[in-house]
Amino acid sequence: TEAENIRNVELQGVDMIGFIFYPKSPVVCADARDLPACAKRVGVFVNESKENILMYTDRFSLDYIQLHGNEAPEYCRSLHNAGLHLISFSILLPKDLLSVSAYNGLCDYYLFDTKTPQYGGSGNQFDWNLLHRYNGPTPFLLSGGINPYSVKALREFRHPYFA
């Protein structure tokens, strides 16, 4: 069951577990009983209204909000000002790193993931080497095709702002 999966993941010592609140996703969080006891709860949203994000945050006691759509800095500012902890960003090319500066101070973390035309996880491996060019003040998390074969590279990845 989903609850068993969450407990098993939590037993691995993870810091955060993401829950999808995007209706078009094949995996959508619907039951508060399935939430982790210790790991931080991250709600993943795609172009969702502020009102719905606030409602889900309250209902599921979310610790972080991951924005995975086309959210503008002004929108992130309104969520940040409402007291929400934000995680956001997808990049494709080195030049995409330049656009993150507009979000400085609005996101608690950036999640650098592979940018694709569709929303959600593509399974495409993200080129973490692009991040050696990142020198912003916001710490970041990695995503993008993480699997058992990439764990070694993930553990070896070093950057002063890698959380």
Model-derived features: positions:
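Conserved N-terminal beta1-alpha1 strand-loop-helix module at the mouth
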Residues: 1-163
